[in-house]
Amino acid sequence: MQVSRVLAALCGMLLCASGLFAASGDFCDSSLCLNGGTCLTGQDNDIYCLCPEGFTGLVCNETERGPCSPNPCYNDAKCLVTLDTQRGDIFTEYICQCPVGYSGIHCETETNYYNLDGEYMFTTAVPNTAVPTPAPTPDLSNNLASRCSTQLGMEGGAIADSQISASSVYMGFMGLQRWGPELARLYRTGIVNAWTASNYDSKPWIQVNLLRKMRVSGVMTQGASRAGRAEYLKTFKVAYSLDGRKFEFIQDESGGDKEFLGNLDNNSLKVNMFNPTLEAQYIKLYPVSCHRGCTLRFELLGCELHGCSEPLGLKNNTIPDSQMSASSSYKTWNLRAFGWYPHLGRLDNQGKINAWTAQSNSAKEWLQVDLGTQRQVTGIITQGARDFGHIQYVASYKVAHSDDGVQWTVYEEQGSSKVFQGNLDNNSHKKNIFEKPFMARYVRVLPVSWHNRITLRLELLGC
């Protein structure tokens, strides 16, 4: 009797809370709010996050001690709080200052060179104060070696939810919490922030469809915390396939299925590299032993088969500001200090004003990158941004290229200009690979459709 009263009271509170939320606005994508926050839209379609107890900030990303406590960065990286309290995207208000030899949003990736067989060659980064140790320089022009440890898109969103599947899903909290495969993204936050297999699944697996044959060189895994307790994969196997039907397991030295060591807690990162690398379209992870539940967040590492898919320098500022230009630039409140200039249109750029936005919503607008010299361009990654809470992005676009910046060729496939699918939100990465890579010094992105304003952050891929 007492139990039923407690359940009735709990249900009453849930119904009351849901009524309060509904009165405050319509529900929106919960992934926009971190740490289990509830996403609502206001009368002007502005995004609001109702934060759970213990969290605050625009997207429920801060604790009372600030976004750098505990330190979200890896490999002894320093967490720096940004000066702006209001930012142009939904990332937490910090950046990770990576030590030499590491890169990534959280300094999680070791910047090493691997040859096409996945064998370690040498570390690319050398401290300024150190004397460089002679090492063979990879001849990228002949494809003798290639840096093949790029994140393939689980964390950034280039791998869409529809590309991720699993054998089963755990349903928690009276069936209201779905720990689905689309949540198994590295560093995902929130109360429900990972994939967990059903307790009744004796042979669980999670699969990623890369949509094309790629070279896969490794995997990074994380556990998660469910109901306040750590859960993670202690060991797992990896299988791969070209057609999604016939799978082969990675083998160990004795010819048996190789078991990879997983994690030791719910949050630390574990990196396993494959030697040799895999050529596959489908990758499956099979948990072998788990701590409490089989709960996983992960990222795949690799590159295109041709080995020519490295970032060309927008995100890491190798391409200087002077080599980025645009047809026009929007200024918030018509103030130059709040200009969304072309040099801001760099992938994952952060800050209150952190992207390029065109002055007008017109198909005549463009964003241009001067690569400095002629390069082979094989792909592009795009991203939107937010202007004081307003989500803005390019939904579709064309690409043009030139050798002299005067005569332009619009990229074509099957005899007509190709319209690429762009973004669906302000934060996720959208990666498009060119079926016909081209040589060019200048590249332009030509928006075709957009949401709110033409707003863009990007990276070009190639070699």
UniProtKB/Swiss-Prot annotation:
<keyword id="KW-0732">Signal</keyword>
<dbReference type="GO" id="GO:0006910">
    <property type="term" value="P:phagocytosis, recognition"/>
</dbReference>
<dbReference type="InterPro" id="IPR000421">
    <property type="entry name" value="FA58C"/>
</dbReference>
<dbReference type="InterPro" id="IPR000742">
    <property type="entry name" value="EGF-like_dom"/>
</dbReference>
<feature type="disulfide bond">
    <location>
        <begin position="73"/>
        <end position="96"/>
    </location>
</feature>
<keyword id="KW-0472">Membrane</keyword>
<dbReference type="Pfam" id="PF00008">
    <property type="entry name" value="EGF"/>
</dbReference>
<dbReference type="GO" id="GO:0007338">
    <property type="term" value="P:single fertilization"/>
</dbReference>
<feature type="domain" description="EGF-like 1">
    <location>
        <begin position="24"/>
        <end position="61"/>
    </location>
</feature>
<comment type="function">
    <text>Contributes to phagocytic removal of apoptotic cells in many tissues. Specific ligand for the alpha-v/beta-3 and alpha-v/beta-5 receptors. Also binds to phosphatidylserine-enriched cell surfaces in a receptor-independent manner. Zona pellucida-binding protein which may play a role in gamete interaction. Plays an important role in the maintenance of intestinal epithelial homeostasis and the promotion of mucosal healing. Promotes VEGF-dependent neovascularization.</text>
</comment>
<feature type="glycosylation site" description="N-linked (GlcNAc...) asparagine">
    <location>
        <position position="61"/>
    </location>
</feature>
<keyword id="KW-0964">Secreted</keyword>
<feature type="domain" description="F5/8 type C 2">
    <location>
        <begin position="308"/>
        <end position="463"/>
    </location>
</feature>
<feature type="disulfide bond">
    <location>
        <begin position="148"/>
        <end position="303"/>
    </location>
</feature>
<keyword id="KW-0968">Cytoplasmic vesicle</keyword>
<dbReference type="Pfam" id="PF00754">
    <property type="entry name" value="F5_F8_type_C"/>
</dbReference>
<dbReference type="InterPro" id="IPR008979">
    <property type="entry name" value="Galactose-bd-like_sf"/>
</dbReference>
<dbReference type="GO" id="GO:0009897">
    <property type="term" value="C:external side of plasma membrane"/>
</dbReference>
<keyword id="KW-0278">Fertilization</keyword>
<feature type="disulfide bond">
    <location>
        <begin position="33"/>
        <end position="49"/>
    </location>
</feature>
<feature type="glycosylation site" description="N-linked (GlcNAc...) asparagine">
    <location>
        <position position="316"/>
    </location>
</feature>
<dbReference type="InterPro" id="IPR050633">
    <property type="entry name" value="Neuropilin_MCO_CoagFactor"/>
</dbReference>
<protein>
    <recommendedName>
        <fullName>Lactadherin</fullName>
    </recommendedName>
</protein>
<feature type="glycosylation site" description="N-linked (GlcNAc...) asparagine">
    <location>
        <position position="426"/>
    </location>
</feature>
<dbReference type="GO" id="GO:0008429">
    <property type="term" value="F:phosphatidylethanolamine binding"/>
</dbReference>
<dbReference type="GO" id="GO:0006911">
    <property type="term" value="P:phagocytosis, engulfment"/>
</dbReference>
<feature type="disulfide bond">
    <location>
        <begin position="98"/>
        <end position="107"/>
    </location>
</feature>
<feature type="disulfide bond">
    <location>
        <begin position="51"/>
        <end position="60"/>
    </location>
</feature>
<feature type="disulfide bond">
    <location>
        <begin position="308"/>
        <end position="463"/>
    </location>
</feature>
<feature type="glycosylation site" description="N-linked (GlcNAc...) asparagine">
    <location>
        <position position="266"/>
    </location>
</feature>
<dbReference type="GO" id="GO:0005178">
    <property type="term" value="F:integrin binding"/>
</dbReference>
<feature type="disulfide bond">
    <location>
        <begin position="68"/>
        <end position="79"/>
    </location>
</feature>
<keyword id="KW-0325">Glycoprotein</keyword>
<keyword id="KW-0677">Repeat</keyword>
<feature type="domain" description="F5/8 type C 1">
    <location>
        <begin position="148"/>
        <end position="303"/>
    </location>
</feature>
<feature type="disulfide bond">
    <location>
        <begin position="28"/>
        <end position="39"/>
    </location>
</feature>
<dbReference type="GO" id="GO:0001786">
    <property type="term" value="F:phosphatidylserine binding"/>
</dbReference>
<dbReference type="GO" id="GO:0050766">
    <property type="term" value="P:positive regulation of phagocytosis"/>
</dbReference>
<feature type="short sequence motif" description="Cell attachment site">
    <location>
        <begin position="87"/>
        <end position="89"/>
    </location>
</feature>
<keyword id="KW-0130">Cell adhesion</keyword>
<dbReference type="GO" id="GO:0002080">
    <property type="term" value="C:acrosomal membrane"/>
</dbReference>
<keyword id="KW-0245">EGF-like domain</keyword>
